A protein has these predicted regions:
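C-terminal amphipathic "assembly/sorting" segment characterized by alternating charged
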Residues: 207-213
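Compositionally biased, intrinsically disordered low-complexity regions
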Residues: 27-29, 167, 204
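Generic multipass alpha-helical transmembrane bundles of integral membrane proteins
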Residues: 1-93
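C-terminal transmembrane-bundle signature of multipass membrane proteins
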Residues: 74-202, 211
Length: 213
């Protein structure tokens, strides 16, 4: 695969570093509560749209700047395959879909490499235009700087721990995920390290008393 070096790689690296720093809610990853859905999913409830969009923009910039000739299907198609479900019928399950799409991609690339390299029908050569490289990198960096500022605001103003607790529980997407996938036990678990209650955050439990277990 062809690539060209430039300052855009430094910008992309900075965006990627910010994206790693702003990963939140590691201590609150759950599985759909029994009885809530016919298919139980892996739910990373704090991985909501601000982080997903910033990640997608960074990942696109990184791969376009590093492996430009397969950006169309390795970046755009793979990212849409997990982002569209995460924004529609599978809220809170972006990480699950991302894992599956990467597994399929790596497996196909390993088992059927002749399909994914020239001169296959789905292969297309990138323009190798430095202006495109710098635009992708700048957009990714700006998005991740904005995400970092929002992340820092949530930590400082609300005094929340981004690792052991959750940050984005005021967002509508967060509330939707909790209502669709969490029973009372998980609702109380998600907020056990912040002062706000499930009622105050908009996902009322059936019982006002946390389960004993």
């Amino acid at each position: 695969f062809r690539t060209i070096g430039g300052d855009w790689n430094l910008l992309s690296a900075a965006a990627g570093l910010l994206n790693i720093i702003t990963i939140t809610g590691l201590g609150k990853i759950i599985v759909t509560s029994p009885g809530k859905r016919s298919v139980r999913g892996l739910i990373w409830v704090d991985m909501v749209w601000p982080w997903v969009i910033a990640y997608d923009l960074w990942n696109h910039a990184f791969l376009y700047n590093s492996l430009a000739d397969y950006t169309w299907y390795c970046t755009l198609a793979l990212l849409l395959a997990c982002t569209i479900p995460a924004f529609t019928w599978a809220k809170g399950q972006w990480i699950w879909f991302r894992c599956f799409t990467l597994v399929f991609w790596i497996s196909m690339n390993t088992l059927l490499p002749e399909v994914l390299v020239p001169p296959s029908d789905i292969f297309n050569f990138a323009t190798m235009d430095p202006r495109a490289n710098i635009v992708c990198a700048v957009v990714a960096l700006v998005a991740n700087v904005m995400l970092f500022a929002y992340w820092l605001y949530k930590i400082v103003v609300f005094k929340r721990n981004p690792i052991t607790g959750v940050l984005y529980c005021e967002l509508g997407e967060f509330r939707t995920i909790v209502r669709e996938h969490c029973d009372d036990k998980d609702k109380y678990f998600l907020v056990d390290r912040i002062p706000e209650t499930p009622e105050e955050l908009g996902f009322e439990p059936e019982s006002p008393t946390p389960p004993l277990d």
